[in-house]
Amino acid sequence: DLILIPGGDGIRHVLHEKVISETLKKCISSNIPIATVCGAAAFLTKANILKERRFTCLLETYEKNRTLFEKAIYTGNQLEKDELIITAKPTALAELAIEIGKMLHLFKNEKQMDSFYSFCKGENE
């Protein structure tokens, strides 16, 4: 199992919904990984999950929400993995897919993982 939360400007309409924070807290306490894309990392901060954890999103998103992210450690990297949490910029979706696959033990071997990565990058046509 894994929770994947896409980002986008629409998150601001539901960011303060308590049911989302409660669900994410239950996932973490049940050892269910959570992956977010860009601004969706804000859901993790609202649930107090990113406190003192490394995360990433677009710099513009971070700067617009600096106070929301003040207890987290912003890196600006393409992708961050911190225990059960994966955060990624929208420019790192192939890398995110690989990290999710590794976390869920979906690849039989390195060759399969490399082939999947190439496919995600549009290199296997």
Could you describe each region identified by the protein language model?
Residues 1-35, 39-125:
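Active-site-adjacent pocket-lining segments in enzyme domains
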